[in-house]
């Protein structure tokens, strides 16, 4: 079978970047970077726009993972972004640039860095690091973060049902996980299970070739179709040292989960950058009544609203990232930023879909793809509703959780 990236690119694909017009980084956040990081970001953007983006709609339509694009991402250092010593703003702008071309790819790189590699490097044993860190950094191995369960999503901290039982010099892990990104293609899974001895939620490193690990692809999704989400069943025996030594209580993971929630806010920024790319390009190329769509006031109003949503999201994310660097970011900030950015991304995608008319329903014009993908980021890493409850509790001192 011919790799998707080797197949011809359809002529109908719109150019992402419109030369001579303002960059979709409307607030010029990249100007805050040091020159070396700015040059690196420009190189990453160029690779994503010219070597990656033209192929992604076909992967999305086919519900296939883009394995043949990983070597190029590894060459750019995206497999070890969280460990390379770059500035926080640079890392977040990279996440936005990846989301600008595709949210599945962004989810893979983000979860890979923020959760899988980040947790093994930060919470793992020396043996676990030696076994997995190098392979993950080069994308020679992929990881899966196994927390959500079939019956427990928003209530996972209190309701997690997967169990870990110590049996001599082994751990026995039994349970089920759902919606696990890369679950069918990962080489290693970080599995969260409740210790039957003390009731604490603990992390375990589980090679996916371990007998009793079974992953089934979730098909028919309306969004994140490139990401291979999976149902996972576990009935495995692991050596005693499979436990993550820095993750023997769920509290140990909260800071990483908080930071990953903020990262999803940057996905919302990137998605809106992609929306503006496609909407502006289409409005300039598409002719109606012998004029480009961009010459009509209603279309310009939609473009301006998308731009405002994007700028508002980017400005919020910049300040929240600043608070994080200063050690002052609280869960309220991460929840508010994630909820707001993804809500505005949803609105921006809908505005662009309307402007494209019937063509907006076709994935070849990309907006339909972005709309579906945005629905996923609106819901994962804390649904919109749950994040608003976190913010409301922080602002009023009253919990509305039931």
Language-model features, listed with the residues they occupy:
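A short core secondary-structure module
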Residues: 176-215
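A gly/ser-rich beta-alpha-beta helix-loop segment of oxidoreductase catalytic cores
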Residues: 144-165
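Internal helix-loop-helix
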Residues: 67, 71-142, 182-188, 324, ...
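Alpha-helical transition-metal enzyme core signature, strongest for iron centers
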Residues: 136-139, 269, 273-276, 303-313, ...
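Glycine-rich phosphate/cofactor-binding loops in nucleotide/flavin-utilizing enzymes
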Residues: 2-30, 94, 115, 356-402
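Glycine-rich phosphate/pyrophosphate-binding beta-alpha loops
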Residues: 178-183, 260-263, 376-384
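Glycine-rich beta->alpha junctions and the first turn(s) of the following alpha-helix
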Residues: 28-35, 214-311, 377, 393, ...
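C-terminal helix-coil-helix/basic helical segment that borders enzyme active sites and/or dimer interfaces
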Residues: 53-61, 280, 284-291, 307-340, ...
């Amino acid at each position: 079978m011919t790799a998707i990236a080797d197949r011809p690119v359809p002529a109908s694909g719109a150019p992402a970047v419109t030369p001579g017009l303002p960059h979709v980084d409307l607030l010029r956040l990249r100007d805050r970077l040091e020159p070396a990081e700015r040059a690196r970001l420009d190189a990453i953007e160029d690779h994503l726009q010219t070597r990656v983006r033209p192929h992604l709609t076909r992967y999305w339509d086919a519900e296939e993972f883009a394995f043949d694009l990983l070597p190029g991402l590894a060459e750019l250092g995206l497999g070890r972004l969280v460990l390379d010593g770059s500035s926080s703003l640079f890392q977040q702008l990279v996440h936005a640039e990846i989301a600008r071309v595709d949210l599945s790819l962004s989810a893979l790189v983000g979860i890979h860095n923020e959760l899988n590699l980040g947790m093994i490097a930060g919470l793992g044993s020396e043996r676990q690091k030696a076994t997995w860190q190098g392979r993950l950094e080069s994308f020679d191995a992929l990881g899966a973060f196994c927390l959500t369960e079939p019956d427990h999503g928003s209530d996972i901290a209190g309701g997690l049902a997967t169990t870990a039982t110590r049996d001599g010099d082994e751990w026995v892990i039994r349970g089920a996980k759902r919606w696990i990104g890369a679950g069918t293609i990962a080489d290693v899974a970080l599995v969260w299970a409740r210790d039957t001895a003390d009731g604490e939620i603990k992390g375990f490193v589980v090679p996916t070739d371990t007998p009793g690990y079974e992953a089934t692809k979730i098909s028919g999704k309306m969004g994140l179709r490139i990401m291979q989400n999976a149902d996972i069943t576990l009935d495995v025996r692991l050596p005693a040292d499979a436990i993550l030594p820095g993750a023997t209580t769920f509290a140990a993971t909260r800071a990483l989960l908080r930071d990953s929630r903020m990262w999803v806010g940057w996905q919302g920024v990137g998605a809106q950058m992609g929306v503006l790319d496609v909407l502006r390009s289409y409005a300039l190329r598409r002719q109606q009544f012998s004029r480009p769509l961009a010459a009509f006031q209603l279309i310009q109003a939609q473009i301006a609203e998308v731009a405002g949503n994007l700028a508002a999201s980017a400005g919020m994310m910049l300040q929240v990232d600043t608070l994080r660097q200063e050690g002052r970011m609280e869960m309220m900030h991460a929840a508010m930023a994630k909820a707001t950015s993804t809500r505005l991304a949803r609105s921006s995608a809908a505005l662009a879909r309307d402007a494209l008319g019937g063509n907006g329903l076709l994935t070849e014009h990309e907006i339909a793809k972005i709309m579906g993908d945005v629905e996923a980021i609106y819901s994962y890493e804390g649904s919109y509703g749950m994040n608003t409850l976190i913010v409301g509790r922080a602002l009023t001192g009253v919990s509305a959780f039931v």
